[in-house]
């Protein structure tokens, strides 16, 4: 059950990848049909307008996801994917192409902001990184399938048919995912819990083999809603900077200039045949998908920070080499040799990019924010990604035509150098931590006391944490520990009643119970200092015996 749900959810990544990958080869044929060059503003606009749509989609996804849930948000994205793909495949002119690209862009933005959050909320800490990377694997796999299928259509069909079929076929995965929504994909248990649906949340969590006691954080607010103001709080600012900064670095690495414009890059680098640049985009997409698959096994083994550092510094070296070679192509380096060098260097670049800066930003985005702010924060970080993406994608082909390959990649190298500095000083390690531990880590960094207090050894599910100063939540934990109550999760509003049910029948027994809790936390100096206060609070909270 769990594997099928993960695969169905990750289909959104495939749609994201297919629709971003298909435009590379399709545009290379479409430009001849509609009569514009690969360095024209029309060429750049067709790419960039979808990214602008994705920026808007990422913004509105937060409102849909918070108000109606993750599943309806994914359903909206599927509907837009179908409409945009079919409309673009049948487009009679450039204007209709642009409209359909906006629709597809909205779908990409909604999907890219929602699915990493959904996957993070239904996965245990041990497998959370690999699960979110699975979405990236489907994304890069979609780019690979798009490159291969579009190349076949371009080579073996007429100029007005190949690109239309390749784009229109992108509606099929959206239909499949919409079908999966009806029969396989449940709502996020965290979202359900935040809306007060404790029983439904438990039912979903049982199917995923996830301990609902970890999800007590969701009870803090009566609902999850979009509000960007809390993101400016003292313990949230660094998280916003980190998640948004990593998304911007991902785009400034030049990855989507390669995925959108590899045909143009290889053509300018020496592959002057009209078909060869399109065909050679296939091995590049394959390298991206292959090394994203590697990340599934490395992200939870070697950690987020280490993978990021290796990735960004390796990419910087490759970009500098590409820029140097770009200056000498056509002069000291022949086009035949330069084209081969470019192909090899771009392949190595993707091998370094994919398991690090390619997927880790999405993992971190899904991990570092509390439940009630996760949709807002994911919206901001994803908008940062698409904002940087639209800038790079709009400017890149124009720069290629104005200052050539060497000058363009020199600028990208400079941006990547800034990214290396950012990662070195800002990236943190979240490998193996529960969402509560991650929250405490960022609060400590901000000079604030932890929100969750560890009362013993916490398992992978994060049980054993309570929110400091909250007797109601302490009672909720007791309910989670009692098998006789079905491991139920109670909401904050019912916490006092729950405490009464699990407490001992007299004041002295209640006092003894809390003494035992304090003793079990004796390793915490703060707990020792506050034992008397906790004890007295427990006595006051207990029901009095009738006289």
Swiss-Prot record:
Location in the cell: Membrane
Keyword field contains Membrane: yes
Cytoplasmic side: 1-2, 65-78, 123-136, 186-245, 298-308, 361-385, 429-547
Superkingdom: Eukaryota
Alphabetical UniProt keywords: Membrane, Sugar transport, Transmembrane, Transmembrane helix, Transport
Extracellular side: 26-43, 100-101, 158-164, 267-276, 330-339, 407
InterPro entries noted in UniProt: MFS_dom, MFS_sugar_transport-like, MFS_trans_sf, Myo-inositol_Transporter, Sugar/inositol_transpt, Sugar_transporter_CS
Identification of the protein by name: Membrane transporter D1
TM annotation in the entry: 3-25, 44-64, 79-99, 102-122, 137-157, 165-185, 246-266, 277-297, 309-329, 340-360, 386-406, 408-428
Disordered as annotated region, ranges: 449-468, 510-547
Keyword Transcription appears in the UniProt entry: no
Main location: membrane
Topological relation to the membrane, as annotated: Multi-pass membrane protein
CDD domains: MFS_HMIT_like
A cellular-component GO term for this protein: membrane
Source species taxonomy: Eukaryota, Discoba, Euglenozoa, Kinetoplastea, Metakinetoplastina
GO MF annotations in UniProt: transmembrane transporter activity
Organism: Leishmania donovani
Family note: Belongs to the major facilitator superfamily. Sugar transporter (TC 2.A.1.1) family.
Ranges of Polar residues composition bias in the record: 519-529
């Amino acid at each position: 059950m769990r594997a099928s749900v993960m695969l169905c959810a990750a289909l959104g990544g495939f749609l994201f990848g297919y629709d971003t990958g298909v435009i590379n080869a399709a545009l290379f044929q479409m430009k001849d049909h509609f009569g514009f060059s690969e360095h024209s503003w029309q060429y750049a606009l067709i790419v960039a307008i979808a990214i602008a749509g994705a920026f808007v989609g990422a913004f509105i996804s937060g409102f849909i996801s918070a108000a109606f849930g993750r599943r309806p948000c994914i359903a909206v994205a599927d509907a837009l994917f179908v409409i945009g793909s079919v409309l673009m495949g049948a487009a009679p002119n450039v204007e209709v192409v642009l409209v359909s690209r906006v629709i597809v862009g909205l779908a990409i933005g909604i999907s890219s902001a929602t699915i990493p959050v959904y996957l993070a909320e239904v996965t245990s800490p041990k497998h959370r990184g690999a699960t979110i990377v699975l979405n990236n694997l489907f994304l890069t796999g979609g780019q690979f399938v798009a490159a291969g299928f579009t190349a076949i259509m371009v080579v073996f069909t007429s100029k007005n048919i190949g690109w239309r079929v390749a784009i229109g076929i992108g509606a099929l995965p959206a239909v499949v995912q919409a079908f999966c929504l009806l029969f396989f994909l449940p709502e996020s248990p965290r979202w359900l819990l935040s809306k007060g649906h404790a029983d439904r949340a438990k039912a979903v969590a049982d199917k995923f083999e996830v301990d609902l006691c970890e999800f007590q954080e969701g009870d803090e607010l009566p609902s999850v809603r979009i509000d960007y103001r809390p993101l400016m709080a003292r313990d949230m600012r660094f998280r916003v900077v980190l998640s948004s900064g990593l998304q911007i670095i991902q785009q400034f690495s030049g990855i989507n200039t390669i995925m959108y414009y590899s045909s143009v890059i290889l053509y300018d680098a020496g592959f002057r045949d009209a078909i060869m640049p399109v065909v050679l985009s296939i091995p590049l997409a394959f390298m991206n998908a292959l090394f994203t698959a590697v990340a599934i096994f490395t992200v939870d083994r070697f950690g987020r920070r280490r993978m990021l550092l290796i990735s960004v510094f390796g990419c910087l070296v490759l970009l500098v080499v590409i820029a140097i070679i770009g200056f000498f192509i056509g002069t000291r380096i022949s086009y035949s040799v330069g084209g081969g060098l470019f192909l090899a260097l771009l392949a190595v670049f993707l091998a370094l990019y994919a398991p690090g800066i390619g997927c880790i930003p999405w993992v971190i985005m899904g991990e570092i924010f509390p439940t009630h702010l996760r949709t807002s924060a994911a919206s901001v970080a994803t908008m940062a990604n698409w904002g940087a993406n639209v800038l790079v994608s709009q400017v890149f082909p124009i720069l290629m035509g104005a200052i050539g390959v060497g000058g363009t990649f020199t600028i990208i190298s400079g941006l990547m150098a800034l990214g290396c500095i950012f990662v070195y000083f800002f990236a943190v390690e979240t490998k193996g931590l529960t969402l509560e531990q991650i929250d405490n880590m960022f609060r400590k960094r901000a000079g604030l006391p932890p929100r969750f207090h560890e009362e013993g050894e916490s398992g992978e599910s994060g049980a054993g944490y309570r929110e400091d100063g909250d007797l109601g939540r302490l009672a909720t934990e007791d309910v989670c520990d009692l098998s006789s109550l079905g491991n139920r999760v109670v909401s904050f509003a019912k916490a006092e009643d729950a405490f009464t049910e699990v407490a001992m029948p007299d004041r002295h027994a209640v006092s003894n119970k809390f003494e035992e809790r304090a003793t079990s936390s004796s390793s915490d100096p703060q707990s020792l200092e506050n034992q008397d206060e906790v004890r007295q609070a427990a006595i006051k909270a207990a029901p009095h015996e009738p006289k």
